[in-house]
Amino acid sequence: MNPNQKIITIGSICMVIGIVSLMLQIGNIISIWVSHSIQTGNQHQAEPCNQSIITYENNTWVNQTYVNISNTNFLTEKAVASVTLAGNSSLCPISGWAVYSKDNGIRIGSKGDVFVIREPFISCSHLECRTFFLTQGALLNDKHSNGTVKDRSPYRTLMSCPVGEAPSPYNSRFESVAWSASACHDGTSWLTIGISGPDNGAVAVLKYNGIITDTIKSWRNNILRTQESECACVNGSCFTVMTDGPSNGQASYKIFKIEKGKVVKSVELNAPNYHYEECSCYPDAGEITCVCRDNWHGSNRPWVSFNQNLEYQIGYICSGVFGDNPRPNDGTGSCGPVSPNGAYGIKGFSFKYGNGVWIGRTKSTNSRSGFEMIWDPNGWTGTDSNFSVKQDIVAITDWSGYSGSFVQHPELTGVDCIRPCFWVELIRGRPKESTIWTSGSSISFCGVNSDTVGWSWPDGAELPFTIDK
């Protein structure tokens, strides 16, 4: 073959290879286009892999999970019918408290992306329990955590994550803009209540299934505020308590009945010389009991109980085992406010069992440290300080904070009674520690009628952080 023939032969071979390669590329493009058309036609929208999406269709929750298999998204669906959380059962009989969750948020936040929070609380649907919390629009160990000791700011939001997990941007969902909040599930959807705005004109925004359904305007123009724990649902209606007025004197208190996110009824309590803040509410035999904070003049806790028509009764826990902080040493109680060390206070809870009461309280009488559960078999109505059970939760040498109640309905647990539970906030940072921030983690316990143990489950983070030095 002469040189010209060799050149022609090599050129022909290259041209054939090029044509074949071009045809393969065209075929590949057509294949990808057809595959994409089929996929989007079936799913209607592109979704990220390994993500769970919940949609609401005709009163049925549809759980959709996309699973990544060989770069192809396959959609699996499992429909879960909604229920009505009746709340008609009585509280389960219990002999003690079993540890349920601990998020270790501050320890994890020294190195990971964890929100600066306060006022965490837990609420359960018939499918899951979630931790709700008020963020400060900042992460731990970051410059924006500076000054987060402040209670009310436009940066605070209500968010939630699965119970027991540290609250981070990666596992949390936004619920509402709020510096005071509550949330609960009626068996069909989540109701959230978020209060934000100026002290002299704040507004509570009600959302149902994530959509704004109603609002409540401050009626006394003096820091409208709500529970900082779960609202309570009975037979499709949910109930919450709000306060508006002075934190150190007579204020105004209202109960709200809410159905599918809309206020259907409210009543203002006729409660002279009473002070209700940050109520912890739970259903029991079709009615609601709330145990609250007296920030004015009581070192024992006020309560209000009401039926679904908002017909109510009010009182104070009579026990000489006092539940607030600060408080005097245990002694003789009163069915009205106990005045010694009665000013200021802390959010807390109790569970009523007939004439008896489980009282949760800090171990210290004057600082937010330690926590214990006490069973006073006559404490709801009797004024002595005799009790029969004390269970340690946090040692007096470790910080605690707010505490509150939540319940697990029979639709979740499968038992024929309402399980009482509680959470404890473990506050760290300012004003007691040398940091630029204030935040907290949380633990929770549920009542059982079997073996339990007392111990100390503290926050456990070593401070200060890098940002504080």
From Swiss-Prot:
Posttranslational modification: N-glycosylated.
Catalytic residues identified in the record: 151, 402
Side Intravirion, residues: 1-6
Compartment(s): Virion membrane; Host apical cell membrane
Regulation: Inhibited by the neuraminidase inhibitors zanamivir (Relenza) and oseltamivir (Tamiflu). These drugs interfere with the release of progeny virus from infected cells and are effective against all influenza strains. Resistance to neuraminidase inhibitors is quite rare.
Region (Involved in apical transport and lipid raft association): 11-33
Region of interest: Head of neuraminidase: 91-469
Membrane-traversing stretches: 7-27
Coiled-coil intervals: none
Signal peptide: none
GO CC terms: host cell plasma membrane; membrane; virion membrane
EC number assigned by the record: 3.2.1.18
Subunit structure: Homotetramer.
Protein task: Catalyzes the removal of terminal sialic acid residues from viral and cellular glycoconjugates. Cleaves off the terminal sialic acids on the glycosylated HA during virus budding to facilitate virus release. Additionally helps virus spread through the circulation by further removing sialic acids from the cell surface. These cleavages prevent self-aggregation and ensure the efficient spread of the progeny virus from cell to cell. Otherwise, infection would be limited to one round of replication.
Additional remark text: The influenza A genome consist of 8 RNA segments. Genetic variation of hemagglutinin and/or neuraminidase genes results in the emergence of new influenza strains. The mechanism of variation can be the result of point mutations or the result of genetic reassortment between segments of two different strains.
Similarity annotation: Belongs to the glycosyl hydrolase 34 family.
Protein name: Neuraminidase
Native source organism of the sequence: Influenza A virus (strain A/Chicken/Hong Kong/715.5/2001 H5N1 genotype E)
Organism taxonomic ancestry: Viruses, Riboviria, Orthornavirae, Negarnaviricota, Polyploviricotina
Encoding gene, per UniProt annotation: NA
